[in-house]
């Protein structure tokens, strides 16, 4: 599972005890939280010993009485003992994200800062294609090695 940062929130699905849930990936949350209205009535819960900070004013905070089996978005095996409260959507916190091997990466730019400045001075607009109508290719051309040593640049 991968998600690029955009206007859309990064949500993914997880299967907890055989039931599918969708939740927001929240690297700022220590623990995962299931929305009270999505918690199955027949699953046991207890009043939480600790409160939750950062989710508004949660008056009723519960926690699962059991450690639950969970499958991540790419079927990663994990366990979770989620908190349960009245929130609009489920939150996948670092307790699950670590078990799923989640990473935050920022890829290095394709071109050096110097070449980016040169291209910008020449009128290049990032995300647009090259050419008069800015409709040319938008991704770099991949260099291929000519193993046969035939064609342009090689003698007949």
UniProtKB/Swiss-Prot annotation:
Transmembrane segments: none annotated. GO terms for biological process: proteolysis; viral translational frameshifting. Autoproteolytically processed at the N-terminus. Expected C-terminal autoprocessing not detected. The sequence shown is that of the processed Pro protein. Keywords: Aspartyl protease, Autocatalytic cleavage, ERV, Hydrolase, Protease, Transposable element. InterPro entries: Aspartic_peptidase_AS, G_patch_dom, HERV-K_Pro_peptidase_A2, Peptidase_A2_cat, Peptidase_aspartic_dom_sf, Retropepsin-like_cat_dom, Retropepsins. Retroviral proteases have roles in processing of the primary translation products and the maturation of the viral particle. Endogenous Pro proteins may have kept, lost or modified their original function during evolution. This endogenous protein has retained most of the characteristics of retroviral proteases. Active as a homodimer. This is Endogenous retrovirus group K member 25 Pro protein. It comes from Homo sapiens (Human).
